[in-house]
Amino acid sequence: MFLNSILVVITDLAAGLLGNTSFRRHFHLLLSALLLFGPLLSLWVSHYSVFAKRTHFLYRVFLRSGWGWTCIFVGSFVFVLSFSVRRSLTLSLRHLSRLAVAGGLWLGFRKLLCLLENATGSCYEPLSAALEMTSGTNGEGQPLLLLREAETKETCVRSGMLWRGYEVSEDALLLCLCCLLLAEETAVFGPYLNLGGPSEAPLRILFLFCVLLLSLWVFLLLCLLAYFPEFPTQLLGGALGCLSWRALYQGWYRLRPSWYCPGRPGVGLLSTQSKQDELLETQTNAKEID
């Protein structure tokens, strides 16, 4: 009973924050500010910190599988929320289709960025020590590099050679997209609670996991910007993530739900009670105005 009371208090506070109009309106601006000024933290952070190593537990377990973690927790929350209200598998699948669309967009960006990197970059092999002693170094004292043709970035890096070219940070893109997606999908929980919707412990626990995951993604984004600054690749990646969110949640999903549009989060969950449904959609609309 005591733990359940704590769970209720924490989730109510988190739902109030995520459903707040000011938070919804300015959260993407917060991420933009992090992308712009986060690299400046590299002037003060310690490079001997555990977060300065790419092999850190959080990077290996969460960042490399970021989209998977997001789908697991957000998908579970969306399904339980929608199914507990309407008991309609069709409605639940319609709301889950937003994750499928975002996942397809993420995979498409990965393929496109891979093609861009391979088309604009080149692979270089450092000359051996003996050959460097014979040929010398370049004018700046840097070791000579031998250009290797017809090499992709993946095979080049795997062979221990150097890859130089134009890049867009996939990590920044993924983290920004996941943060904005989490904020959108969980924001409906506040209006849902205000309307007296069923909120048992399993649903609140899933919501709490989503909030913790959102906090973790923001923290990892800050760590990447502070300990591994890569300007402007991270800025470009974050911009793509924000543009993807705006195109989906501020554009396409605002259309009326149909076979070609899954609709906004929370729409149709309480349509069996027309007055409550109208109130929920009105509150959701007001909080999504940018």
Curated annotation (Swiss-Prot):
Q: What does UniProt give as GO cellular component?
A: endoplasmic reticulum membrane
Q: Where is this gene product found?
A: Endoplasmic reticulum membrane
Predominant cellular place of this UniProt entry's protein:
endoplasmic reticulum
Q: Which domain of life is it from?
A: Eukaryota
Question: GO MF terms on file?
Answer: coenzyme A diphosphatase activity; diacylglycerol binding; triglyceride binding
Keywords per UniProt = Endoplasmic reticulum, Membrane, Transmembrane, Transmembrane helix
| Transmembrane intervals | 1-21, 26-46, 65-85, 173-193, 205-225
Q: Name one GO biological process term.
A: phospholipid biosynthetic process
Q: InterPro entries, per this entry?
A: FIT (IPR019388), FIT1 (IPR046402), FITM1/2 (IPR046401)
**Membrane topology designation:** Multi-pass membrane protein
Family listed: Belongs to the FIT family. FIT1 subfamily.
Please give the function described in this protein's UniProt entry. May play an important role in the formation of lipid droplets (LDs) which are storage organelles at the center of lipid and energy homeostasis. May directly bind to diacylglycerol (DAGs) and triacylglycerol.
- Name by which UniProt lists this protein: Fat storage-inducing transmembrane protein 1
- Encoding gene per record: fitm1l
